[in-house]
Regions:
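N-terminal strand-loop element at the rim of the active site
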Residues: 1-7, 11-62, 152, 165, ...
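Short alpha-helical donor nucleotide-sugar binding micro-motif in glycosyltransferases
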Residues: 241-242, 249-254
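Short hydrophobic beta-strand element within catalytic cores of glycosyltransferases
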Residues: 279-282
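Conserved acidic donor-binding segment of nucleotide-sugar-dependent glycosyltransferases
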Residues: 294-295, 299-306, 314-319
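Nucleotide-sugar donor phosphate/pyrophosphate-binding loop at the beta->alpha transition
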Residues: 64, 106, 116-134, 172
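Nucleotide-activated donor-binding/catalytic signature segment of Leloir-type glycosyltransferases, i.e.
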Residues: 227-245
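Aromatic "clamp/platform" in nucleotide-sugar-dependent glycosyltransferases that forms part
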Residues: 262
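Conserved donor-binding/catalytic core segment of Leloir-type glycosyltransferases
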Residues: 180-197, 203-206
Length: 354
């Protein structure tokens, strides 16, 4: 169940839609997503998908999500409700509480980065944390997708006994190794064009770099109201959201992936890129250092520091990027497999209590 699934949340849902090998007959899955994002769940049978009308993150859309969720809970009688992201978690758990005289599903909640991890005022962080502390009492298991998120949540008062660490995982890729070549260095950004994803940091950094051999492709669009403008720039190509197969093709053509986020749960985009042999140029925010190690699988710069990112873009060279990408591919194979993520998630579905 999700209030919005654009980006990494959709990838996670698609991945865990495949039950553990040999165990598919034990599960019947139903999904609730925005009707204009249903196509993000390609590969999932349409009869399993329920939708609601969403025009943005506004009160009417949130009320429609709550109403549709209550309908699904009453009709489908699920044993487990898995809520993805903060707004879904708040609304979904409130709906479940209201329906408890009639329906009592186990509640699994994955915030994909708690709201109190965002860059915001201390007052807002305290309010967000208070809401999560209250709602944890009606939550059976909270999935944290990074050690950073789990430790930070514990410091904000979320009980460790309710939390379970499950890293996002990715299916292994067996594509041919990249070759250095003599073409310009092709950089890639995939994600929402907003403040959280640090898209403004990337634009400022790229504008500072005095290199004619760099090309940047930006894939994504605004989802929330805090979107960043996309000014026309030399050597920058803007693309809307594309299909997963098209994203894979872009990964294959790129020389490096840029992830300048200000906060993350545990981003799927760098996992996808590393699985394709791409080095990642990432900020040091929240969970990203658990995935990207400086001068090992990519480059790491201080979050929000566009000059530091520009400095990295000034020094990168193709042969070194190839070496970093190959190391990153090995790290993903060893530590972040889809099979492990699926098995751990379904273990919670079977016994989602602490």
């Amino acid at each position: 169940m999700a209030e919005t699934i654009k980006g990494g949340v959709a990838t996670v849902i698609r991945t865990i839609s495949a039950s553990p090998e040999g165990d598919a007959a034990n599960y019947e899955l139903v999904y609730l997503v925005p009707e204009d994002q249903e196509k993000e769940l390609h590969g999932i049978a349409p009869p399993q998908i329920r939708t609601f009308a969403r025009s943005g993150r506004n009160v009417p859309s949130l009320l429609r999500f709550a109403w549709r969720l209550s309908q699904v809970l009453i009709k489908e009688k699920p044993d487990v409700v898995h809520l993805h992201s903060t707004f879904s978690g708040v609304i979904g758990r409130c709906v479940c509480v209201l329906l408890r005289p009639w329906r009592k599903p186990q509640i699994v909640y994955c915030p994909h980065a708690f709201s109190f991890l965002m860059e915001s005022s201390p007052t807002k962080q305290k309010v967000y944390a208070w809401i999560e502390r209250v709602l944890q009492k009606v939550t059976d298991v909270i999935i944290c997708v990074s050690q950073y998120e789990l430790d930070k949540a514990a410091r904000f008062g979320i009980e460790r006994k309710r939390m379970k660490l499950i890293y996002n995982g990715i299916h292994h890729k067996d594509d041919a190794p990249k070759a250095a070549g003599t073409e310009p260095i092709h950089l890639l950004f995939v994600g929402r064009l907003d403040y959280q994803k640090g898209f403004d940091v990337l634009l400022k950094a790229f504008a500072k770099v005095q290199r004619k051999d760099l090309k940047l492709t930006v894939v994504g669009s605004a989802v929330n109201e805090d979107s960043v403008d996309c000014p026309p720039m030399d050597s920058v190509e803007y693309l809307p959201w594309v299909t997963p197969s098209e994203v894979q093709a872009l990964y294959q053509k790129a020389d490096a992936l840029i992830v300048p986020s200000r906060w993350e749960g545990f981003a799927m985009v760098p996992l996808e890129g590393m699985a394709m042999g791409l080095p990642v140029i990432a900020s040091n925010c929240t969970s990203l250092p658990e995935l990207v190690t400086n001068e090992v699988s990519g480059y790491v710069f201080p979050s929000g520091d566009h000059q530091a990112l520009a400095d990295v873009l000034t020094i990168i060279q193709k042969p070194r990027l190839l070496d970093l990408g190959n190391e990153g591919r090995s790290i993903v194979r060893e530590r972040f497999s889809a099979a492990l993520m699926i098995r751990q998630t379904y273990d919670l579905y079977r016994a989602p209590t602490y």
